[in-house]
């Protein structure tokens, strides 16, 4: 039974949805924030939280084999070793003490052409995690 099993389908078939989330995650790792529709932003938030959690584990684990395994998993999603290194070595270091909520979704209004609700998706700063 599929009770309470939810997935953001985004009106796309599986491989298209996977490709979309991979592309959006690449952009957010590279630029730090992006503007997209709210539905895509909500789907991206869960996707990126899982990716950053893997990056944190890869950055903090003492087991070299586990670290390499996690880096390879992240690289399979991002498809670019430079972005993988940036995520693990630079971004993940800021979130070591944090247990989730690495990505923020802020609604910013409606798109002019079709009135789709737009959101700003950004990585949460490390300084704001204290408190």
From Swiss-Prot:
Recorded GO CC terms: cytosolic large ribosomal subunit
Record's signal peptide: none
An MF annotation (GO) of this entry: structural constituent of ribosome
Domain of life assignment: Bacteria
Keywords tagged on the record: Ribonucleoprotein, Ribosomal protein
InterPro entries: Ribosomal_bL17 (IPR000456), Ribosomal_bL17_sf (IPR036373)
GO BP of this protein: translation
Subunit structure: Part of the 50S ribosomal subunit. Contacts protein L32.
NCBIfam families cross-referenced by the UniProt entry: L17
Family, similarity comment: Belongs to the bacterial ribosomal protein bL17 family.
Protein known as: Large ribosomal subunit protein bL17
Organism: Thermotoga maritima (strain ATCC 43589 / DSM 3109 / JCM 10099 / NBRC 100826 / MSB8)
Taxonomic placement: Bacteria, Thermotogati, Thermotogota, Thermotogae, Thermotogales
């Amino acid at each position: 039974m599929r009770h309470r099993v939810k997935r953001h389908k985004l009106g796309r078939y599986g491989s298209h949805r996977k490709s979309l989330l991979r592309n959006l995650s690449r952009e957010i790792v590279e630029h730090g924030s992006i503007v997209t529709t709210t539905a895509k932003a909500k789907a991206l938030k869960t996707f990126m939280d899982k990716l950053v959690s893997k990056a944190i584990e890869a950055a903090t684990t003492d087991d070299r084999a586990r670290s390499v395994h996690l880096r390879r998993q992240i690289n399979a999603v991002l498809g670019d070793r430079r972005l993988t290194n940036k995520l693990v070595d630079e971004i993940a270091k800021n979130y070591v003490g944090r247990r989730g909520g690495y990505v923020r979704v802020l609604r910013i209004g409606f798109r002019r052409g079709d009135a789709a609700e737009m959101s700003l998706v950004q990585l949460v700063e490390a300084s704001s995690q204290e408190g």
